[in-house]
Every structure is written in structure tokens, then in C-alpha cells.
Amino acid sequence: MYNFELKQLDATAAITETLNVIENFCETYKLENDFGTISLAMNDLLILIIENSDSKNLELAINFNLNNQQLAIQITSNQTLDNIMPALSNASPENNDQNIFVIKQLIDNISFDAENNQLLVEFDVK
């Protein structure tokens, strides 16, 4: 089992640090085949969150939990994530930006906790 938390990072630092953590655990746990999928989905998801934030003071806490054959990544924001939830929930090539559709296709499961401004993203890894 692997657990790591990035605490309250500004948004741009969150992207860099997230990719570093993903690279490290993929290397450590021999998940190189999953690196591209996870890193692309998380990079695009974090960019989507940044682009849809209400102010320049966006901070994110990101918790990584690798257990058995699943990687769960919890993203907690200091701002509401309400504006990206509908886009991700209804992702399709017809009604969304192509990047949103790609994010949704790469992630195995995504859930929202609007009350706590959290997203839980899950990837099945082998």
C-alpha cells in the first residue's frame, strides 16, 4: 500500500508535484504501463479545475492511495468544484470539449463531494 499527500499547493505547483508523485510511484511499483494514462488524465483534470476556478487564490490538496490494483486520488479544493462536476458527469464527444471527454475515458471512476469541495478519481492498475 502506498499513501502520499500533497498539502494545500497553489494550482500550478499542484500540477508539477502531482506528475512527480505519479512518476515516482509508477516507477516504484512497476506501473510504467499506467503512467501515460494516469499522468495525462490528472494533468488535464487539474488544468480543467484551474481554468474553472473563481479566483487566482486556488489551492489544492491531493491525496494518493495505491491499494491492491487501484489508485485513488482525492483532490480537495479551497473553492467550489460545482462548475466542473456537470461537465465531467455528462462527458460525451457531442456535448463537451474534447479534453473533458478524454479525461472521462481515461479515469475508471470519478465521484464528487460538493459539500467538501472534493473529487475522488480512481484508476484500475495492474
Model features per residue range: what roles?
Residues 52-62, 70, 116:
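G2-box/ATP-lid motif of Bergerat-fold
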Residues 1-40, 51:
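Bergerat-fold GHKL ATPase/HATPase_c domain
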Residues 15, 82-84, 119:
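Intrinsically disordered, low-complexity acidic/polar segments
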Residues 7, 63-65, 74-76, 122-124:
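Residue-level recognition of well-ordered beta-strand positions that form the cores
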Residues 68-101:
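Glycine-rich/acidic phosphate-handling loop/turn and adjacent ATP-lid/helix
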Residues 1-13, 92, 97-126:
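Flexible, glycine-/charge-rich segments associated with ATP-binding catalytic modules
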Residues 32-59, 105:
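Conserved ATP-binding N-box helix of the HATPase_c
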